[in-house]
Amino acid sequence: IGGEGTSERIETQVKTALSEDGKDVFEISSKDGKPFIQGSSLSALTTGIGWYLNHYAHVNLSWNNLTTDLSGVEFPVPEVTERRECSADYRYYLNYCTYSYSMAFWTQERWEQEIDWMALHGINLPLAAVGMDVVWKNVLTEAGYTREDIDKFVAGPGFQAWWLMSNLEGWGGPNPDWWYERQEQLSKFILGRMRELGMEPVLPGYGNILPSNASEKMGVDAIDQGNWCSGFRRPAFLMPTDKRYAEIAQLYYKNLEKVMGKAKYYSMDPFHEGGRTKGINLKEAYYTIYSEMQKHSPEAKWVIQSWGDNPRKEALDTIPKGGFVVLDLYSDGLSRWEKNGYEGHDFLWCMLHNFGGKTGMHGRFDPLLNNYYNALEKYPDGVKGVGATPEGLETSPILYDLLFELPWMKREEGKDWIKRYSEARYGEKSEAMEKGWDILAKTVLNCPTPSQDIEAVICARPSLDVRRVSGWGTCKIYHDINKVREAATEMLKDKERFKDCPTYQHDIADVVRQTLTDSTYYLIKDIAASYEKKDMEAFKAQYTTFLGILKVFLIFFNNKF
């Protein structure tokens, strides 16, 4: 992000005195004939830079357009000062699943782009999981495990998300020596860059997991946790009463610090999506997990996902107020904060949005636009921020731009947000693009149920009765597909005007792709009906259309899809 001479055309400054109450603040004004951006913290400053690029220079840096040469972009000099104060202490980012569905093989270059994107969006609390395979290899080596034993425990890159959440072990491995060396170097780069830009990384803390054979190999009291999803062997759970408990926990933290440094926030999710709690004093277990974290890092807070049975009542009753940061993981679809506000613990309003790395358009625009503010009104002392917790990245970027602007906006600004977004996204005002996005925000991007992302019929195994592509998915459409086609028609009106705009190229491909995949959902039903009635003329015409759509996908699409 930059270009020759860009840094000389804009002035920036970190000025802590901008904030009177500890909240992050940025100001955009002018100085010596140049734009002047100040922030009360480094994160506030980078957010202000992102705000200026979007809403003054009309440059939208997005997943499909993460690098840009700004040397030829006009930087308007503000005539008045714009001041923005953030209602969110924390702006959290990522999900363990993201590390396997999207990030498993990212390079240093791709990570640098993402971290810059994070900084421009004001993210100050990212989950950092790259390098955990190295940490565990070192822990188990010191504990006396052989390399063969370690290979049976540490998962491969595409499955480390579920390994780190104690759902499985060893799956997708073993990892070669060069991989461990690569990941350690990459981890140090990622964490260094995050910290350099004012972020506090959330590191995986010790949540009592050990290899499933720990009782035999280490002579400790570790409870078998059975299987996850019927077929994956879960790691064991180390009993907090074991005489070596503190020794093992601190062995973990020592090796974690060697690879990833010390943190102020640690993520642990014991009994995630199951496991066995019989015979375990849960209050004691939660207290010892918290205590060992605090022993290692006295100011640390425990970040826990609100998912499945977590956080259990025993956890909420045991951990002191201020000790937890609860991620209300699916606030946009199945929120839990309304029930009791997590009994006074700090929590974040999170948008999960994406399941399984699916690439179709999907979202809940109205809940996103309104429900963070609703939570703030009901629990003003409990809501400490927002978070994006997608399982997969690089889809529907409009939702992420909105989410991370919410804490810097007033609720009433939401009614014109799409107009401002459209101008930022394409560099100038466009009635056609505004209308197109407005239609999408009321249809495909506004799912009325907790349903996951829609799966495309064309991705399923060939069948005349397609209901899903994957075991947990659905192909059922919840929106009016004619409205999505109408949005595409509107947006195509400006195809000549924006043909060289990378964000337009991406978006028009995305919307047209969605109209085509939507049509196949009903087309396969028509094909099945014609087959059942033995109407071969209709059957041939319909399947020819279906195959034609497949051909379009194979030949003509934007390389981001």
Regions found by a protein language model. Give the residues of each.
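Acidic/histidine-rich, surface-exposed loop or edge segments in extracytoplasmic proteins
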Residues: 30-31, 95-99, 524-526
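Ordered core of a single globular domain
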Residues: 501, 505-554
